[in-house]
Amino acid sequence: MANRIKKGDQVVINTGKDKGKQGEVVRVDGDRVIVSNANLIKRHTKPNPQAGVAGGVVEREASIHISNVNIVNPATGKGERVGFKVLEDGRKLRVFRSSGEALDA
């Protein structure tokens, strides 16, 4: 099945410590997404001179389950659910469920 959320989509987070935050999808891994500047975690890394990596505390984005984000509708500015509409030529088109407005051109 095709994913309702793709890389580059503007999304809003529904649950968790970052509830209400908006950001762009950086990566989609199956049923998990990474959203820019959301769900930040700290990783303690060892220095590795061979790879040129300095040690220390690194802050980066962690993944969020795909069910915990909604795509932002540019017309309303709110997060809304997305469904699919099958065109006559067999292609699938992502549409907002509330308005039926097409998400992809």
Swiss-Prot record:
Keywords: Ribonucleoprotein, Ribosomal protein, RNA-binding, rRNA-binding. GO terms for cellular component: ribonucleoprotein complex; ribosome. InterPro entries: KOW, Rib_uL2_dom2, Ribosomal_uL24, Ribosomal_uL24_KOW, Translation_prot_SH3-like_sf. One of its GO terms (biological process) is translation. It comes from the Bacteria. GO terms for molecular function: rRNA binding; structural constituent of ribosome. Pfam families: KOW, ribosomal_L24. Belongs to the universal ribosomal protein uL24 family. PANTHER family: MITOCHONDRIAL RIBOSOMAL PROTEIN L24. Part of the 50S ribosomal subunit. One of two assembly initiator proteins, it binds directly to the 5'-end of the 23S rRNA, where it nucleates assembly of the 50S subunit. One of the proteins that surrounds the polypeptide exit tunnel on the outside of the subunit. This is Large ribosomal subunit protein uL24. It comes from Xanthomonas oryzae pv. oryzae (strain KACC10331 / KXO85). The gene is rplX.
